[in-house]
Amino acid sequence: MARSIKKGPFVDNHLMKKVEAQEGNQKKTVIKTWSRRSTIFPNFIGITFAVYDGRKHVPVYVTEDMVGHKLGEFAPTRTFKGHAVDDKKTRR
């Protein structure tokens, strides 16, 4: 179920303050965040976020296509190693 339109998109206040502080700077630094639930706004374009995936911070460079999505969508939490190989096939 999608979020109600009357509520509007969600962004953590501490993350929004960091983005607004960086808008005036010429030098763009990486913003480290644990807020995977925050929605990407148009003023986030061109900023690199380090989104926490439970183990490390994954760098996510925000582009135009990402607006409206959540930051956590671009930092996968699970790594798929592949299915177990059947030893019977390799022995023949």
UniProtKB/Swiss-Prot annotation:
RNA-binding in keyword set: yes
Keywords: Ribonucleoprotein, Ribosomal protein, RNA-binding, rRNA-binding
GO cellular component terms, A-Z: cytoplasm; small ribosomal subunit
GO BP annotation list: ribosomal small subunit assembly; translation
A Gene Ontology molecular function term of the record: structural constituent of ribosome
Source species, domain of life: Bacteria
UniProt xrefs under Pfam families: Ribosomal_S19
Family the UniProt entry places it in: Belongs to the universal ribosomal protein uS19 family.
Function: Protein S19 forms a complex with S13 that binds strongly to the 16S ribosomal RNA.
PANTHER family on file: RIBOSOMAL PROTEIN S19P FAMILY MEMBER, SMALL RIBOSOMAL SUBUNIT PROTEIN US19M
Protein name per its UniProtKB record: Small ribosomal subunit protein uS19
Organism whose genome encodes this protein: Staphylococcus carnosus (strain TM300)
